[in-house]
């Protein structure tokens, strides 16, 4: 349910308003606009959605910061080559995961605050999502000083990065950097190979 609600937030139609005076809000507005355009005429195939949203995700999310936070202290033990390979595998997995969620997220409504609020050294952009069946959720985007999103929070405290840390923990413990890399690649390839639901 948590992943579905996050997906709903990402697929909602953007609220037309200028966010030029708040770069953090502008990032979220641009993200929503791209997702909305992607599913406006139907979800299409997973590959279609990956191609459509990948560049916007690349501009909007700080993958190096996200994977570093998801791995935790062990990140410093990896070689630069391992860090680079894992970051790329994380990026690819993230894009495919969000494109996959997008197929299930049409029909939601949401509101974006027109300004961000401080959250430590970052800014938090609050959005409110209403699913087609009437469920309400708060989805916050944590935007860093480089105006890149580095976390997504459900109901203000359920962290996407914390979820990634939990997911990556077992392969990290069992196989270190190689275990994480293998896990991410296999999970991504599995989503791409899956047959669409009827």
List each language-model region with its residue ranges.
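Bacterial N-terminal signal peptides that target proteins for export
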Residues: 1-6
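N-terminal signal peptide c-region/cleavage motif recognized by signal peptidases
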Residues: 14-16
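Early exported N-terminus immediately downstream of N-terminal targeting peptides
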Residues: 21-98
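Extracytoplasmic
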Residues: 23, 30-32, 58, 81, ...
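Soluble periplasmic/extracytoplasmic beta-strand elements of cell-envelope proteins
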Residues: 34, 87, 111, 126-128, ...
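Surface-exposed, charged secondary-structure patches
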Residues: 95-137, 184-198
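Short beta-strand edge/turn micro-motifs at domain boundaries
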Residues: 136-166
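Non-transmembrane domains of secretory- and envelope-associated proteins
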Residues: 157-198
């Amino acid at each position: 349910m948590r992943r579905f609600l996050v997906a709903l937030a990402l697929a909602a139609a953007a609220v037309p308003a200028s966010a030029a005076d708040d770069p953090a809000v502008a990032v979220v507005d641009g993200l929503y606009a791209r997702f909305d355009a992607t599913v406006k005429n139907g979800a299409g195939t997973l590959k279609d959605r990956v191609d459509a949203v990948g560049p916007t995700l690349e501009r909007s999310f700080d993958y190096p910061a996200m994977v570093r936070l998801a791995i935790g202290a062990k990140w410093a033990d990896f070689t630069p080559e391992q860090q680079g390979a894992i970051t790329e595998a994380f990026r690819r997995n993230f894009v495919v995961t969000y494109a996959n969620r997008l197929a299930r997220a049409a029909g939601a409504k949401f509101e974006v605050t027109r300004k961000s609020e401080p959250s430590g050294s970052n800014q938090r952009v609050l959005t409110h999502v209403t699913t087609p069946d009437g469920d309400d959720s708060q989805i916050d985007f944590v935007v860093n000083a480089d105006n890149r999103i580095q976390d997504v929070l459900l109901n203000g405290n359920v962290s996407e990065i914390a979820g990634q840390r939990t997911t990556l923990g077992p392969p990290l413990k069992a196989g270190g950097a190689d275990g994480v890399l293998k896990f991410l690649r296999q999970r991504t390839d599995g989503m791409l190979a899956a047959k669409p639901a009827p």
